[in-house]
């Protein structure tokens, strides 16, 4: 049984992670944290999520519970995730990171910590999205050289970063399959007189509206035809279940940086 701590357990995603951990037969929620100023600190995590009494209470600092968990699952914000990453390094704990919006310097720090403890990091934890990443690699190898590639993503009005980590992950999969770095070919905004698109660029468009959980489409467009690969999520439990699956898988692994491709064994396809 893998003992899991949920960072930001009172948030929308945090509550789903608590539920997903509770229903997974190989996992148990044994700790959860919230911001120190939260009025929910001290509340029973199970009751908070409508799952009944767990006798596990929200803390304002996971270090207070460090002997009570094996793996942290963190879908919060970069500054909080990096603090929990350092905590895991100091105490030899594993961490599953679902937070997005890291700078290049912060990503480098995560890579450095992964030399000391097991880390899974992915822009999206749904099985379907990670299968899409593999499909995009294959499509890019066949069509990327002669098609225009555009990525469109849509999320709810409360999402604070754009484009989404999943959209960037799609772009990285396509660019990598074509021998490029995404940072060299990505175009994140178009406005006014932009001129014709270049051959290699990968364009991104972002929608923020209503309660959209997450929709992503990658388009390979040629003259006379186009191929679109789309994923639509309708329930955040999809992501939560995948993250808990990753936590259970990670617990038995040595220090290193892993992705959902590793968790799901997609490199074997």
Curated annotation (Swiss-Prot):
Identify the residues that bind NADP(+): 35
The UniProt record lists the keyword Thylakoid: no
- UniProt: (S)-2,3,4,5-tetrahydrodipicolinate binding residues: 156, 165-166
Quote the pathway field. Answer: Amino-acid biosynthesis; L-lysine biosynthesis via DAP pathway; (S)-tetrahydrodipicolinate from L-aspartate: step 4/4
Q: What's the domain of life for this entry?
A: Bacteria
Gene3D superfamilies in the record:
Dihydrodipicolinate Reductase, domain 2, NAD(P)-binding Rossmann-like Domain
Q: Where NAD(+) is bound, by residue?
A: 8-13, 34, 98-100, 122-125
Q: Which GO terms describe its biological process?
A: diaminopimelate biosynthetic process; lysine biosynthetic process via diaminopimelate
Spell out the SUPFAM superfamilies in the cross-references. Answer: Glyceraldehyde-3-phosphate dehydrogenase-like, C-terminal domain (SSF55347), NAD(P)-binding Rossmann-fold domains (SSF51735)
Give the EC number: 1.17.1.8
Q: Which reaction does it catalyse?
A: (S)-2,3,4,5-tetrahydrodipicolinate + NAD(+) + H2O = (2S,4S)-4-hydroxy-2,3,4,5-tetrahydrodipicolinate + NADH + H(+); (S)-2,3,4,5-tetrahydrodipicolinate + NADP(+) + H2O = (2S,4S)-4-hydroxy-2,3,4,5-tetrahydrodipicolinate + NADPH + H(+)
Any GO MF annotation of the entry = 4-hydroxy-tetrahydrodipicolinate reductase
Asked if the keyword NAD belongs to this entry, the reply reads yes
Which Pfam families does UniProt cross-reference here? DapB_C (PF05173), DapB_N (PF01113)
> By its UniProt entry, which InterPro entries does this protein fall under?
DapB_C, DapB_N, DapB_N_CS, DHDPR_bac, NAD(P)-bd_dom_sf
Query: What keywords tag this UniProt record?
Result: Amino-acid biosynthesis, Cytoplasm, Diaminopimelate biosynthesis, Lysine biosynthesis, NAD, NADP, Oxidoreductase
Q: Which GO terms describe its cellular component?
A: cytosol
- Any idea which residues are catalytic in this one? 155 (proton donor/acceptor), 159 (proton donor)
Q: Which PANTHER family match?
A: 4-HYDROXY-TETRAHYDRODIPICOLINATE REDUCTASE 1, CHLOROPLASTIC-RELATED, DIHYDRODIPICOLINATE REDUCTASE
Q: What does this protein do?
A: Catalyzes the conversion of 4-hydroxy-tetrahydrodipicolinate (HTPA) to tetrahydrodipicolinate.
> What HAMAP family does this protein's entry cite?
DapB (MF_00102)
State what protein this is by name: 4-hydroxy-tetrahydrodipicolinate reductase
Organism expressing this protein natively:
Vibrio parahaemolyticus serotype O3:K6 (strain RIMD 2210633)
| Name of encoding gene | dapB
